[in-house]
Curated annotation (Swiss-Prot):
The lineage of its organism: Bacteria, Pseudomonadati, Pseudomonadota, Betaproteobacteria, Burkholderiales. Belongs to the CsrA/RsmA family. It comes from Bordetella petrii (strain ATCC BAA-461 / DSM 12804 / CCUG 43448). Homodimer; the beta-strands of each monomer intercalate to form a hydrophobic core, while the alpha-helices form wings that extend away from the core. This is Translational regulator CsrA. Transmembrane segments: none annotated. One of its GO terms (biological process) is mRNA catabolic process.
Length: 65
């Protein structure tokens, strides 16, 4: 897993057409903005697990530190 550090307003690029921007931080919550083509699904982990029940995910949803 790639781990990145970003500040509010900073963006990361995934490939040529996906961006993730840090919009805000409030305590332990981070607000992201994403931009991706319509054919790319973007979901929070708990929503993804509902859509794909029983799928083996390498994310546990718990902080590994």
């Amino acid at each position: 897993m790639l781990i990145l550090t970003r500040r509010i307003g900073e963006t990361i690029h995934i490939g040529d057409d996906i961006t993730v921007t840090v919009l805000g931080i409030n305590g332990q919550q981070v607000k992201f903005g994403t931009s991706a083509p319509r054919e790319v699904d973007v979901h929070r982990q708990e929503i993804y697990e509902r859509i794909h029940p029983g799928s083996a995910s390498h994310f546990s949803g718990k902080h590994p530190y």
